[in-house]
Design a protein with these regions (language model features):
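Glycine-centered hinge/linker elements that transmit conformational signals in sensory
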Residues: 225-256
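Short helix-initiation/N-cap motifs at beta->coil->alpha
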Residues: 73-82, 173-178, 255-269
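Conserved N-terminal structural module of periplasmic/extracytoplasmic solute-binding proteins
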Residues: 2-107, 291, 304-306, 346, ...
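Extracytoplasmic/periplasmic solute-binding protein
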Residues: 144-146, 177-228
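Hinge/lid segment of periplasmic solute-binding proteins
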Residues: 102-153, 296
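C-terminal capping/gating helix-and-loop segments adjacent to ligand/active sites or protein-protein/ligand interfaces
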Residues: 351-357, 361, 369-423
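Extracytoplasmic/periplasmic substrate-recognition and gating elements
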Residues: 62, 89, 249, 287-350
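Short helices/loops that flank or line small-molecule/ion binding pockets
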Residues: 80-92, 110, 161-162, 181-185, ...
Length: 426
């Protein structure tokens, strides 16, 4: 499947003006009497949007006097299996973060299939979504997820650190390796890598796969679905080799497996590295750690032809309503607020993303100029896992990448294991 309808959306969004996943802790609005049922004005919420959900909750409470939101924030690797367990046991909150498509344990297809999510097809914003985004909210023809932001993955550079090092962002694969060598020689590694959090392991690989795999074969996913291609006998092998070449060249700080996502943010924000390969959502978190810093997302090159470079870009995680929500009316009110101009703009401003709807009036963030350009010129591919048949493929990839970095596995073994999980189907 090719992302060939996104440019229309971005052109509209910018005329009036892209696995996500963040690490966090727990926070809560003050409770009100009465628990979550009946006439209660308390909404329960589980989120993975560290650094942005806080402002959205405040805005929602302000717009709805008397309403209080009790919410928790946690990282994707902890959140995804946890929310599935809570839904199965009947202890899940009213509203929760849910990912598009079918690629992880908290993805729309995975949670809607057993009946855990409320059908949102009748909500006013659903038919305003572009087809490429709307399809990822659906299971069996019904929409279940409020997707508010478009995100991209690439190299996010600390501009001040670059200037101090006297370096500029690379446009080709050869330049990238030279950039890493020069940065290492100056004592400031090119990129922070927080592979202690397993979801982070995929981001460099996805950035390389976008160009290496889809540049010459935009229909690779269709071939996989038809049984005509495999991970192990495709340019995925090249992309994975390039990932490890970056590691051997010194593109990352020492001990990525011992570095958390939170710690990697600090390295990039404070100039201990020149940047970080992440989604655009990290920009807001870097600015929190360094308010005076300037951070810019650029494509990560994988070949020596800049014209062939592609960026992974797609709708990020959104919000869904528990089919057994204790306060269903308030839950619907919240997801509709998320999809309103106020709610959507609050989210995308904090996350440094782009709105999924074109009528919010939001001006594009300058830090996303290259992402906006790539989407507008049809140079993007979906996040790879969103089109995989089950969450096991991604889970195998994430654990396997950690094992490769620890010397316990090999690229060939990992890709064979991913193929086996892919072929196992839904």
């Amino acid at each position: 499947m090719k992302t060939r309808t996104l440019p229309v959306l971005i052109a509209a969004a910018t005329s009036v003006a892209v696995l996500a996943a963040c690490s966090g802790g727990t926070n809560a609005g003050s409770d009100s009497p009465g628990g979550g049922g009946g006439g209660s004005q308390t909404l329960t919420l589980a989120s993975q949007d560290q650094g942005s959900i806080e402002d959205v909750v405040k805005a929602f409470e302000k717009a709805n006097p008397g309403v209080k939101v009790k919410y928790t924030v946690s990282g994707a690797d902890q959140y995804q299996p946890q929310i599935r367990t809570q839904l199965a046991s009947g202890t899940a909150p009213d509203v929760m973060s849910v990912w598009p498509g079918n690629g992880n344990p908290a993805a729309t297809y995975v949670l809607a299939k057993p009946g855990y999510l409320r059908d949102l097809s009748d909500q006013p914003w659903v038919n305003k979504l572009p087809a490429s985004v709307k399809s990822l909210t659906e299971y069996d023809g019904k929409s279940y997820t409020a997707l508010f932001g478009l995100n991209g993955i690439g190299a996010v550079y600390n501009q001040e650190a670059l200037t101090k090092a006297g370096l500029t962002p690379p446009d080709t694969w050869t330049q990238l390796l030279d950039f890493c060598k020069a940065a290492k020689a100056k004592g400031t590694p090119a990129f922070a890598l927080g592979n202690q959090d397993n979801w982070v392991t995929q981001l460099v690989l996805y950035s390389l796969v976008a160009t290496t795999v889809y540049g010459d074969d935009p229909d690779f996913d269709k071939q996989m679905q038809a049984g005509q291609a495999t991970f192990a006998k495709s340019p995925w092998t090249t992309a994975l080799d390039k990932y490890l070449t970056m590691e051997k060249t010194g593109c990352f700080q020492k001990n990525p497996l011992g570095t958390s996502y939170e710690a990697s943010q600090t390295l990039a924000a404070t100039g201990k590295t020149l940047g970080i390969v992440q989604g655009n959502w990290v920009i807001a978190l870097l600015k929190e750690k360094n308010p005076k810093g300037t951070f810019t997302l650029k494509a990560l090159p994988a070949t020596d032809d800049p014209a062939k470079t592609l960026i992974p870009a797609a709708a990020g995680a959104g919000y869904a309503v528990n089919a057994k929500a204790k306060n269903p009316e308030l839950a619907l009110k919240f997801v509709n607020f998320v999809m309103s101009p106020e709610g959507m703009n609050t989210f995308v401003k904090k996350q440094g993303s782009l709105p999924t709807l074109s009528d919010t009036g939001l001006a594009a963030d300058p830090s996303l100029a290259e992402l906006t350009k790539f989407i507008g010129s049809d140079r993007t591919v979906p996040f790879m896992d969103q089109l995989w048949p089950n969450p096991k493929v991604q889970a195998t990839m994430l654990s396997g990448l950690q094992e490769i970095f620890s010397g316990q596995s090999t690229p060939g073994k990992l890709l064979d294991e991913m193929d086996a999980e892919y072929k196992s189907g839904n």
